[in-house]
Amino acid sequence: MSKAGGNKGGVKTGGRGGAGSSNLQVRVKKKAGTIKESSRRWLQRHLNDPYVHKSRQDGYRSRAAYKLIEINDRYDLLKKGQKIIDLGAAPGGWSQIAAKIVGSTDENPHVVGIDYLHVDPLPGVVLLEMDFLDDEAPQKLMDALGDKPDLVISDMAAPTTGHRRTDHLRTVHLCEVAADFAISVLKPGGHFLTKTFQGGTENELLALLKQKFRSVHHVKPPASRAESVELYLLARDFKG
């Protein structure tokens, strides 16, 4: 999970079954007419997830925080003083980690997040409650940040339909929009990290990123559930 050298900025990390995990399994009983079987399974998995327990212990907004921690431990993306834009920020886990590592404060914010869902305030983070797909969103993000970002991160995913190919295509579209934005605003040498789903239709996106960045590859951090089709695309060293 972590590369040699350990944590950045004092951020805590956790592995599968790490501190706070337990062999005691929580079982969610189904009462007739009260909960769907699929919902019961999701709730039981959530309640028994060691990352969920650890996120509560460490004070993180969500288990997704560990995905960014683990990716950063491996690739050293986040550094003190950087400017960061977080797309699809709710509930705030990635913005929270980014602000802590880069040293963002309310007086001198270096992290701007955007989501159409409400995100409770976070220290050192400017939060925009609007849809990133709105025409005005890109300029509002840049105005709030006040400078070109060193890193654009996106954990956006379209609401799932249950149809794997449809879900993949909708999320790839969000990736493409996020990539276009990152390419238009990043500093030379900057990085772009975005969620995608396994599905094999992102060839055009990969070709674009390989043209604009010096290194592009897929990443699946340990905090991403093994059974999930979720992957991350990491594009490093923007050519400008």
From Swiss-Prot:
Reaction(s) catalysed by this chain, per the record, are: uridine(2552) in 23S rRNA + S-adenosyl-L-methionine = 2'-O-methyluridine(2552) in 23S rRNA + S-adenosyl-L-homocysteine + H(+)
Q: Where is this region: Disordered?
A: 1-27
Give the UniProt keywords, A-Z.
Cytoplasm, Methyltransferase, rRNA processing, S-adenosyl-L-methionine, Transferase
What are the positions of the active site? 195
- UniProt-annotated binding residues for S-adenosyl-L-methionine: 92, 94, 115, 131, 155
Show the Pfam families listed in the entry: FtsJ
Question: InterPro entries annotated for this entry?
Answer: RNA_methyltr_RlmE (IPR050082), RNA_MeTrfase_FtsJ_dom (IPR002877), rRNA-MeTfrase_E (IPR015507), SAM-dependent_MTases_sf (IPR029063)
Q: According to the UniProt entry, which residue ranges have a biased composition of type Gly residues? A: 1-20
* Top-level enzyme category: transferase
Q: Which domain of life is it from?
A: Bacteria
Compartments annotated for it: namely:
Cytoplasm
What Gene Ontology molecular function terms does this protein carry?
A: rRNA (uridine-2'-O-)-methyltransferase activity
What EC identifiers does the entry list?
2.1.1.166
Cellular component GO terms, alphabetically? cytoplasm
Family per similarity comment:
Belongs to the class I-like SAM-binding methyltransferase superfamily. RNA methyltransferase RlmE family.
Q: What's the stated role of this polypeptide?
A: Specifically methylates the uridine in position 2552 of 23S rRNA at the 2'-O position of the ribose in the fully assembled 50S ribosomal subunit.
Please identify the protein, giving its name as recorded: Ribosomal RNA large subunit methyltransferase E
Q: Which organism is it from?
A: Brucella anthropi (strain ATCC 49188 / DSM 6882 / CCUG 24695 / JCM 21032 / LMG 3331 / NBRC 15819 / NCTC 12168 / Alc 37)
Q: Which gene encodes it?
A: rlmE
